[in-house]
Amino acid sequence: MKKKLVLAMAAAMAITSCAVPAFASDDAAGGGKIGISMPTQSLERWNRDGSYLEEQFKAAGYDVELTYSDNETDRQVNDIQNLISDGVDLLVVAAIDGEALNTVMDEAKDAGIPVISYDRLIKSDAVSYYISFDNYTVGTLQGQYVIDTLDLDNAGDKTYNIEFTAGDPADNNAGYFFNGAYDTLKPYLDAGTLNVVSGQTDFDSVATAQWDTQTALERMQNILASYY
């Protein structure tokens, strides 16, 4: 049954429009219990994702335990351990820190519980599936939006100032987002059409711990006060 649960979950998450049929196809297998570990409720997307997954699993006849860990890695480890102790048949985990869950992932593996790494990569061989976007392409689309909005290909002698803000270094996706955007904009930076007045163009300089909006705001306020 666990294998069927994993395959149903992977199919449903990869093809959203087919979510209900994918779950329903295994409903006759007798259901099971799903443990979902989300990073935080402070960002709307995780509320949305957690609620959606819970709704779809319940509609297909599965019991669901949904946890949010308030962006605290130790709390997420504890939440996952509790889900394992509660005897879930499948874990869906959106990691706060993809490198901090190895021990608890091993616990899940030892208990015979498949794990789906949801959106953020968990670097452990205990993970059965990884579901995410093409994150580099997401970054290129962000960069292309800047190009199109400012009409950079027809800028002539016009120049524009730009500053970068990136995501959490602990999130595997953040580097791909940044690299996709930066690589797309680099020709315009090299040509001088775009200028980074602060000089902060490497990922480590522009990253934002835990994707915290207040931290990003304060950094940008400091840049504006110091360089503009």
Predicted ranges, named:
Residues 9, 13-18:
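Hydrophobic core
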